[in-house]
Every structure is written in C-alpha cells, then in structure tokens.
Amino acid sequence: RYTQSEQTLDIDFTKPFDVGLYEPLFVATGFQYRNESYESFAGDTASYEIGPLATQGFGIGSNGFPGLAANSQGRVSRNNIALYIDAEAYITENFMLAGALRYEDFSDFGDTTKGKIAFRWQALENIAFRGAFSTGFKAPTLGQSNVRNVTTAFGTGGELIDRATLPPTDPVSQLKGGEQLTPEESESITFGVVADFDNGLFITADYYNIELTDRISTASGIALT
C-alpha cells in the first residue's frame, strides 16, 4: 500500500492602501511552509514471491496484481517554502489592473519565481473586456517520482506478461533512458468579453491559450527482453 501526507502552514496578510488612484490599492501577501511525505509498504510475503503456478506461466501474486516487495518499500519526504504578493486596484473608474508574484523553494527541485498580470476594462456601460498573462510551475509529486506497481495481463499473443510502472530512477528505467523527473512549467494567456444587458441576458466569451512544457506522464510501453 501507499500513503502520501502533507502538512501546511499558511500566514496571510491583506491591507488596502490609499495611493491616489480611483480606488485604494488592495495588497495581499503571505508565507507558506509545506512538508510532504510518501511511504510505500511491502505486501504479504506470498503476494510477491514466486508461487507454485509459475511453471504454468502465471505471474507472481494473485488476481494479476502482485504485492509490493520488501526491497521496494521505503519513505521519502521533502519540504518547500513560498512567498507571495498580490496587488489589485482600479486605476480609473473603468480600468482595473492586478498583478501577482510567487516565489517557491523546493528541497528537491530548487527555487522558482512565477507571476501573473491581469486587467478588466469597462469599455461601455454593459460591455467589459478582461485578460491575463501568467506563468506556472508544478513540481512532480513524491508519488509520481517514486511509485512502483506490477500487474499481470495478456500479451498480444495471449500469453501472460507482467506490466510494471517504475520510477525514472529505477535501474531498469535508467537502462532504457529514464531520467529524474523535472517540474512542469506553463505560460497562459486569456482574453475575454463580458456583456450584461438590461433584459437580464448575461454573455461571456473567453479565449485561452496554455503552453505546457515538460508535462509529466507515463511512458509508452517498453518491452524488456
């Protein structure tokens, strides 16, 4: 079995400032500390040892899902801290501007700073335009970096085969070119229009363009011979 736990401490502050704009500048800032742990536990010995039906082509374990072997169990953990600041204000009666910055430092992936800028313009009494540009960062979870499991399935010729999901740092993965996972990063652009009519009709239309790099997923099947 697998368990993943997380403990988080957040400290947040918000305050409006009168800086001579149409409305006060609202500022939010804060700090976050997060600790994550991932632990895998070995199954019953009979669930992963070779059984008496191995000579008939059956894999180890029962129901096609072998238990986790004792040499595969373990515990990993990491922590990260984050600092952020977010500001928003109506520059004029009809134009709102917002911006945000977030800094994070991971014990296993280093640090990064990402941001966002957004606006809303009330062009007419019942029509407004809005848009935003932001950058994103997502570190692999401890489960994604360390999960292991094996299932038994039928191959293309009807034979029984074992299919394994292995972490990229496993010797078998490295033999086939596996490397340590890297964080996902993204850039996002949005633009939209909002129309609110007196007869109760409310219309929104938004365009989204999200570019994601280093997306994390399982590899296609790799045969071992």
PLM region spans:
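Residues that define the transmembrane beta-barrel architecture of outer-membrane proteins
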Residues: 3-9, 77-81, 111-113, 175, ...
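Outer-membrane beta-barrel transmembrane domain signature of Gram-negative proteins
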Residues: 1-96
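Outer-membrane beta-barrel signature, preferentially recognizing the C-terminal barrel domain
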Residues: 72-78, 126, 137-204
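Outer-membrane beta-barrel channels and translocator barrels
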Residues: 18-22, 92-94, 122-126, 186, ...
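Flexible, surface-exposed loop regions and adjacent strand-edge segments
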Residues: 1, 43-53, 115-118, 146-154, ...
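Residues on the lipid-exposed face of transmembrane beta-strands in outer-membrane beta-barrel proteins
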Residues: 11-15, 83-89, 117-121, 131, ...
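Transmembrane beta-strands of outer-membrane beta-barrel proteins
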Residues: 25-29, 97-99, 115, 129-131, ...
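Transmembrane beta-strands of outer-membrane beta-barrel pores
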Residues: 17, 33-39, 81, 101-107, ...
